[in-house]
């Protein structure tokens, strides 16, 4: 890959690490022992899985994702093949189109772009030298609406209370 200057690289930060579990309720006690505080537990817009976000320390977030009973999905396939464990690393990007363009210009395969009301997401295929599934997310301001403690969420890389 070629070197890029700051002007070519879109603003980006680590948002959270996603961990696949069979049950959030079973996994949550360990996160609580580590000092994590649950911020959100809700169903994915597709209805195939649920996620719970946890704040760890001042700004680090961990996401647990669990399948919805009776639903076959990427998550049930992942758990059947791998068991519980790290599923993805999410990077918040300030400009999804620019981030995808920068990656694809270097031959990186970006897949499954989806635009929701509250965010856009895309994934870097795990068939890359790291073997990691990278999720790119661009949040919209409406992401925080209706969630408990929205001032503790980050949009555009900044805490909403700033």
Where are the regions a protein language model picked out?
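Vicinal oxygen chelate
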Residues: 2-8, 21-29, 33-34, 52-57, 62, 81-162
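Long, hydrophobic N-terminal alpha-helical segment
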Residues: 2, 7-57
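A low-complexity, Ser/Thr/Gly/Pro-enriched, surface-exposed linker/loop concept
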Residues: 69-73
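Short, tandemly repeated low-complexity microdomains enriched for cysteine and small residues
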Residues: 41-44, 74-80, 115-117, 145-148
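Short, structured motif recognition centered on aromatic/hydrophobic residues
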Residues: 14-21, 30-31, 54, 59-65, ...
């Amino acid at each position: 890959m070629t070197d890029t200057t700051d002007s070519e690289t879109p603003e980006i930060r680590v948002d959270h690490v996603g961990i696949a579990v069979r049950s959030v309720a079973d996994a949550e006690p360990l996160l609580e022992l580590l000092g994590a505080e649950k911020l959100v537990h809700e169903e994915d817009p597709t209805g195939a899985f649920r996620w719970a976000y946890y704040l760890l320390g001042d700004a680090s977030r961990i996401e647990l994702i669990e399948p919805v009973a009776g639903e076959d999905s990427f998550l049930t396939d992942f758990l059947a093949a791998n068991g519980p464990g790290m599923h993805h690393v999410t990077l918040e990007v300030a400009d999804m189109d620019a981030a995808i363009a920068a990656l694809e210009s270097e031959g990186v395969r970006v897949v499954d772009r989806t635009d929701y009301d509250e965010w856009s997401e895309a994934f870097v295929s795990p068939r890359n030298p790291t073997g990691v599934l990278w999720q790119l997310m661009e949040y919209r301001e409406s992401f925080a609406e209706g969630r408990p403690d929205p001032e503790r969420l980050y949009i555009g890389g900044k805490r909403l209370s700033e």
